[in-house]
A protein has these predicted regions:
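Active-site-proximal alpha/beta segments of enzymes that process anionic O-linked groups
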Residues: 138-390
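Short catalytic/ligand-binding loop motif for oxyanion handling, primarily in non-cytosolic enzymes
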Residues: 69-72, 229-232, 261-266, 309-315, ...
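A short beta-strand-to-alpha-helix junction
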Residues: 281-288, 400-413, 456-462, 473-489, ...
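Transmembrane and membrane-interface helices of multi-pass
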Residues: 1-171
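Histidine-centered active-site microenvironments of extracellular/periplasmic hydrolases
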Residues: 425-472
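A long, amphipathic alpha-helix that forms part
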Residues: 170, 343-351, 386-433, 586
């Protein structure tokens, strides 16, 4: 994989980075066998030699296996792949067989013989006296140079170096974006037109979009609420949205976000991809094909958030090609006040836009975000925690009052949704506008021992409401298992895109969802298989080799995790394909 990175078109800086990074990490990889062999020398010279030969061969074998996995799937050895390789039958399910096992064993033995040969050659041939001072100095310079090069490339969005870093096994990046901004430097946001080197490890989309000659261009409005879980959508808590869904839209009762946090939830909604792709798309400043198609058609943009577009970095991913002047953030005051102002701004945008052009609207609401603020007129649960102080609260005792705050905040959110929907009705926009109303992720209140989100894949953290309305959509209730990953294929199909969804997404249009499907959700460092019977959380970072978590679909424990993993092998191999299809070399 390093060879491939060196052969890609790039720059002197990417070559420098890769060389110094490989030197530094080679030392890191040699440390375990070096330390173990030194300890073994306490029992004699030959035990030390044996550990040195075996340890070096095993480490080299691990790196070669990691390189092969990276070439095939676009990511390094992690807990997910490790489990498939070590579970009985797992290697076969990935396409391996007896011949492959035999070849692997022969290759491992050959490495041991090779390392033993190097050892005996070095023992028979005088070795020059090592200048340890110079070696340590050179090693430190390599490590500092590699980290400085990566940090600078990350801040300047210099893709050749960022792409090269993915070739280094188990690479741990260092960034200094916050420190640079504190000194007055501004990070690079916009991306230039991608060339072959910039595309790096992405193969997205797999086929260029084909659009029907008579493709419609309806208005699109995407309304997403922070931390909104599915059971808030009731006639009591959210009467406006409930009534709107009853009269005009489809209410999806079994809908999962693609993440347990904002970053992966929004990413999955716009891209139709699981969150393990986030980092590569961020490095490449690659927007989703949905936004590229909308911009190609000249849609007018009304984009508002009560948080920030820069964190998570949606200005460098979802909206990477949108001029910064069109990204409107409001960070003043509590979330409910920001939501009110942004609804006002969205209504003003609808009044002032060029009516001859279709529009794309996006509004991100903050009302349900912890600490769940709301005005007095939004109180429907009066028994709420009045003084919400993280330092003094007793979580076990106060969780009921905290949940009631959340309910009141969700009710305020509904009031703002009602204002916007009524405003669109007054402007005669509901009949020709596709509306998507959902949450970025859910929120847990100790139902399974956690509070908040971003920690587990419990239903309370990933189960969100979804209402879809627009031209040709009749009121209905859908109980099939749907996902945020299905929204991009749904919208693109309604825009007249003729490609199969697998050309650009992992999800499927909402009206084509099978009953027995699995869904995917992601966190910063894991992807979860969410099946009809079981859940499996799989670490995607290289360091999490043994951190698999298996439960039933209702989040209760299973008795035999290994048996469940063996039963799910074929499905998990499919997941592996989903996680690698849009990397170079993916299938």
């Amino acid at each position: 994989m390093a060879r491939q990175a060196l052969l890609q078109p790039g720059s002197v800086w990417s070559l420098f980075f890769l060389l110094v990074a490989l030197v530094g990490y080679a030392f890191v990889f040699l440390l375990p066998p070096l330390i173990l062999s030194m300890l073994a020398r306490l029992f004699g010279r030959w035990p030390g030699y044996g550990v040195a030969v075996t340890g070096s061969a095993l480490m080299l074998l691990l790196l070669l296996v990691d390189g092969q996995i990276h070439d095939l799937y676009g990511f390094h050895l992690n807990g997910f792949v490790w489990n498939l390789l070590t579970t009985p039958g797992g290697f076969t399910s990935m396409g391996g067989g007896p011949d492959a096992v035999f070849s692997f064993v022969l290759f491992a033995l050959a490495l041991v013989v090779f390392e033993a040969g190097l050892l005996f050659w070095s023992l028979r041939k005088p070795v020059p006296r090592l200048r340890w001072g110079w070696m340590v100095t050179a090693l430190l310079l390599c490590m500092v140079g590699e980290r400085a090069a990566y940090g600078t490339a990350h801040f300047l969005a210099y893709r050749p170096v960022l792409n090269a870093s993915h070739a280094v096994p188990f690479y741990q990046p260092t960034t200094f974006r916050g420190a640079a901004m504190a000194l007055g430097f501004e990070p690079v946001r916009t991306r230039d037109k991608l060339d072959v080197a910039d595309q790096g490890r992405l193969h997205y989309p797999r086929q260029a979009l084909r659009v029907a000659a008579d493709a419609p261009s309806p208005n699109i409005m995407v309304l997403v609420a922070e931390s909104l879980r599915w059971d808030m959508l009731t006639p009591e808590i959210m009467p406006n949205l409930w009534r709107f869904a009853e009269e005009r839209g489809i209410r999806f009762t079994d809908h999962y976000s693609g993440g347990n946090g904002t970053r992966m939830g929004i990413f999955s909604l716009f891209y139709g991809l699981p969150g393990n792709y986030w980092f590569a798309f961020l490095d490449a400043r690659q927007p989703p094909v949905l936004m590229s198609e909308i911009q190609r058609r000249g849609y007018r943009m009304g984009l508002y958030t009560s948080a920030r577009f820069s964190y998570p970095e949606f200005d460098k991913t979802v909206f990477a090609d949108v001029p910064e002047s069109l990204l409107h953030s409001d960070e003043e005051g509590p979330g409910w006040q920001r939501d009110r102002r942004n609804v006002d701004r969205m209504l003003s945008f609808l009044d002032q836009r060029d009516a001859a052009k279709p529009f794309f609207g996006f509004l991100f609401f903050e009302s349900p975000h912890a600490r769940y603020y709301f005005p007095e007129e939004s109180v429907i649960r009066p028994d709420y925690l009045k003084n919400f102080n993280y330092a003094t609260m007793d979580l076990e005792q106060d969780i009921g009052g905290i949940f009631n705050r959340y309910v009141n905040a969700s009710h305020h959110l509904d009031q703002q949704l009602g204002r916007l929907l009524d405003g669109m009705a007054e402007r005669n926009l509901l009949d020709n506008t596709i509306l998507v109303i959902t949450g970025d992720h859910g929120e847990e209140f100790m139902e399974n021992g956690r509070w908040g989100h971003n920690s587990e894949f419990h239903n309370q953290q990933v189960h969100v409401p979804l209402v879809l309305a627009g031209p040709g959509i009749a009121p209905a209730v859908m109980d099939k298992p749907t996902s945020h990953l299905d929204l991009a294929p749904t919208l693109l199909s309604r825009l007249g895109v003729e490609n199969e969804p697998r050309d650009y997404a992992v999800g499927v249009p909402l009206d084509q969802v099978p009953d027995d499907r699995y869904r995917l959700a992601a966190s910063w460092d894991a992807v979860a298989y969410l099946g009809p019977e079981y859940k499996v959380a799989m670490p995607v970072r290289a360091g999490g080799l043994f951190e698999m978590a298996v439960s039933r679909a209702d989040d209760t424990p299973v008795k035999d995790e290994d048996a469940v993993m063996a039963r799910l092998q074929s499905r998990l191999v499919e997941v592996l394909g989903d996680m690698s299809r849009f990397f170079s070399g993916g299938r």
